Curated annotation (Swiss-Prot):
Biased composition (Basic and acidic residues): 70-82
Name of the protein: Large ribosomal subunit protein mL102 (rPPR5)
Superkingdom: Eukaryota
Subunit relationships: Component of the mitochondrial ribosome large subunit.
Keyword Repressor: no
Location in or out of the cell: Mitochondrion
Keyword Signal: no
PANTHER family reported in the protein's UniProt record: MEMBRANE-ASSOCIATED SALT-INDUCIBLE PROTEIN-LIKE (PTHR47939), OS03G0201400 PROTEIN (PTHR47939:SF13)
Chain residue ranges for the region called Disordered: 39-82
Length: 757
């Protein structure tokens, strides 16, 4: 039994009386006219137009004429308009806007002059939420407003079944006899199908079995519903048992029954069983229809038995059952599945010559097969037909396949036409579609065309559309970014990649290319910004990118920033080469940043890179540090050199310091050499001692000379007597006496050594 889903006409009868002014036309103020949602003229039940007297007819006609000639004047409050909303719509709006409370229930009760089943049905049908409909259904009955009939029960059961509220639906169904409403088969069919859609096959079977216990007749309608439910879940053996039981009960299967059985058997891949039922169908004198043939053809195609499918297809035409677009599409799909593309094209041409227009499913089936077979000319022509007829395929991934296949075939013009076809068919092109074209244009060295596509991609911000699922691949954006960075268009490349980063892309190659590109173009600050982004996101930085960035800073005359970039390079585990170290150190030194240059030199020494090649530069920095009073720093660098197996020229440094009067620095450097037993020339001792004595620092000279002699180093310092004299003059007689004895002792040892020789 079919059910009508549209709203029913509501008619009401008055149960209240209003105080109205008298009028000769009583029908003008009839209560149904005032309260009914549908305005219509009602006549008494016993008033048959054919049996009315002529006087009554003339009186009625007179009243109608007077009503038409006399205008009805009604006054409304200013600013308000008459509400023509239907009563059921008003109730639905109230339930949607207000909580389900006693106050709302009373408002609805006061609104309705008299309840009838059509009003309840329409409210259930118009409710925006299921819980509102269920509350209204239960309230109207519990409040004694109405006793639900068969239609309202059926409506509620269907609504609950659609949202899988199956326990509620079942309770309402089983409670119907207590309310005096008899069951019918259609209600159980709804519940069987609802359980089936929810995947609860066992409950569908129980409901079907319960029909017999409850005395509800089971016809072919309920059997068909059961077959559909159990076959959808692959229970073909159960379906066979119930089919045999149905036949034994005297219920004759229909063509629809056999179509369901065949569909289910093929779904479960039971070819032999399907063939037996097909023959049984013919034996019973039931002729196959187009649905039967289509099911069988589709089944043969699933088993890749295209010869059998072709025979059925021919038989279908011989039985004067014209193949439909479904039949042709199924055959095309089957041939493509077994790589018989030419046969698929033959069926397609036959279809068109028969006057049957391909639909979106047909095109969606044929195009991927042509692409896989490399028949791109045919695919191009079919795409043109789709554009001419404005038929878009069901699956938009077909366009991606066309783009890839046409590009692979080397026909970039045809690939570009695919984008135009998408625009014609109102299919939005995604970033992935543009990516395929850009990638293949780069492979063909057609960079200008690739850049035009990229401009469109960037301007329309296609990459940023969150509803898109087809993203641009690294193989697409990396080549164009590299080209732009190598050809003075790094800014455009950065705009592209910043859009990609908003979609979560953190590609190492692309970011390093951006650093290199900005550095080559003389924009080191932009390179460093990219570098910081990579650092924050943990993206590895390449050594070559750092080198270009450092050189870019130095070419701009910014050695400090170059040093910062070099520090980052070292922190990332990269080791700059000797020439890069030298260029940074020299730039800093020439800029007067001696200590900063010293720190870079320390890194170079620590990494043991190019020390021998840069000893001249190291000597300059050490000298500058000592001359500026940064003695401890200089000594630290010298010590680091020694630890790495290299020796600074201390004699040269001592000579320079002594000559320029930097006695304290010379003293500390000499002490450093003596403490570590470094090899020093005697002339260096003499120069330092002379400088100290000349500066009046007799005690310092005394201390140094004592250390020299304690180390066993003999000295022929000519000014030793002068030092002793100065010590005595300054009152340091004790030191003078000690020094005299040490000198005499040293001279005695020297004489003994000469005699022994």
């Amino acid at each position: 039994m079919a059910f009508i889903s549209r709203s029913k006409r509501y008619q009401s009868k008055a149960r209240v009386y209003l105080s109205l002014p008298r009028s000769s036309n009583s029908s003008l103020f009839s209560l149904p006219r005032l309260f009914s949602t549908i305005e219509e003229t009602q006549t008494p039940a016993n008033a048959n137009p054919e049996t009315q007297s002529p006087d009554a007819k003339s009186e009625t006609k007179k009243n109608l004429t007077s009503t038409e000639t006399r205008p009805l004047r009604e006054r409304f409050q200013r600013g308000k308009r008459q509400n023509h909303e239907k009563l059921e719509d008003t109730i639905c709006r109230m339930m949607d806007n207000r909580a389900w409370t006693t106050r709302l229930q009373n408002s609805i009760r006061d609104l309705v002059p008299e309840w009838d089943h059509s009003l309840v049905y329409n409210v259930l049908h118009g409710a925006k939420k299921l819980e509102h409909a269920l509350q209204f259904f239960r309230w109207t009955e519990r409040s004694g407003l109405i006793r639900h009939d068969r239609d309202t029960h059926m409506k509620m059961i269907k609504m609950l079944g659609e949202v899988s509220k199956l326990n509620h639906a079942r309770c309402i169904l089983l409670d119907m006899p207590e309310k005096g409403v008899p069951w019918d088969e259609d209600m159980f069919v709804v519940l069987i199908e609802s359980y089936g859609k929810a995947g609860i096959v066992q409950e569908s079977v129980k409901i079907f079995q319960k029909m017999k216990d409850l005395g509800v007749e089971r016809t072919i309608k309920s059997y068909n519903s059961l077959f559909k439910v159990i076959l959808r879940r692959g229970r073909y053996m159960m379906a066979k048992r119930y089919f045999n039981k149905m036949v034994s009960e005297g219920v004759e299967p229909t063509r629809h029954t056999y179509n369901l059985m065949l569909w289910g058997f093929f779904l479960s891949l039971r070819l032999e069983t399907a063939l037996r039922f097909f023959e049984d169908m013919k034996t019973r004198g039931i002729s196959p229809d187009d649905a039967t043939f289509n099911t069988m053809i589709n089944g043969f195609c699933r088993f890749k038995k295209m010869d059998e499918a072709e025979k059925l297809f021919v038989e279908m035409k011989g039985n004067k059952i014209g193949p439909s677009v479904v039949s042709y599409t199924t055959m095309i799909k089957g041939y493509l599945a077994v790589d018989r593309v030419d046969d698929g094209l033959r069926i397609f041409e036959e279809m068109r010559s028969s006057g049957i227009e391909p639909n979106a499913t047909t095109y969606s089936t044929l195009l991927p097969g042509l692409c896989d077979a490399g028949k791109m000319v045919e695919a191009k022509n079919i795409l043109k037909n789709m554009m001419a007829k404005h038929i878009a395929p069901k699956d938009n991934s077909i366009f991606l396949k066309l783009l890839v296949s046409q590009s692979k075939a080397g026909d970039m013009a045809a690939a570009t036409e695919v984008l135009k076809a998408m625009a014609t068919l109102n299919v939005p092109a995604e970033a992935g579609h543009y990516g395929v074209l850009i990638e293949n244009q780069c492979k063909a060295s057609a960079y200008n065309r690739a850049i035009k596509l990229l401009d469109t991609l960037i301007e329309k911000e296609i990459i940023l559309r969150h509803q898109d699922t087809l993203e641009m691949e690294p193989s697409a954006y990396n080549p164009i970014i590299e080209y732009l960075c190598n050809n003075g268009q790094t800014a455009k490349a950065e705009v592209l990649f910043r859009q990609l980063m908003k979609r979560g892309v953190q590609d190492q190659d692309a970011l390093n290319n951006l650093i290199r590109g900005h550095a080559k173009e003389g924009n080191p600050d932009s390179s460093y910004e990219i570098l910081k982004i990579m650092s924050r996101r943990g993206v590895p930085r390449e050594s070559n990118a750092y080198e270009l960035l450092i050189k870019s800073y130095m070419s701009k005359g910014e050695p400090g920033d170059a040093k910062t970039a070099l520090d980052s390079m070292v922190e990332d585990g990269h080791v700059p080469d000797s020439s890069l170290f030298r260029s940074v150190i020299e730039s800093l030194f020439e800029d007067g940043r001696v200590q900063t240059a010293s720190r870079v030199m320390m890194i170079m020494i620590d990494k043991n890179v190019g020390i021998e090649d840069n000893m001249d530069l190291i000597a300059k920095i050490l000298e500058a540090l000592l001359m500026r009073g940064h003695v401890e720093e200089a000594l630290g660098r010298i010590d680091l050199l020694n630890q790495n197996g290299h020796t600074a020229d201390l004699d040269s440094l001592l000579s320079v310091l002594s000559e320029k009067g930097k006695t304290i620095a010379a003293l500390k450097l000499l002490d450093f050499g003596l403490e570590r037993d470094l090899s020093l020339e005697f002339s260096s001792y003499d120069k330092v001692l002379d400088a100290l004595l000349g500066a009046g620092k007799t005690l310092n000279a005394y201390s140094v000379l004592c250390k020299i002699m304690e180390k066993g180093s003999s000295t022929d310092w000519k000014s030793s007597d002068e030092l002793i004299k100065s010590l005595n003059q300054e009152g340091n007689t004790k030191q003078a006496d000690v020094l005299s004895r040490m000198i005499k002792k040293g001279q005695g040892i020297k004489k003994q050594n000469n005699v022994s020789l």
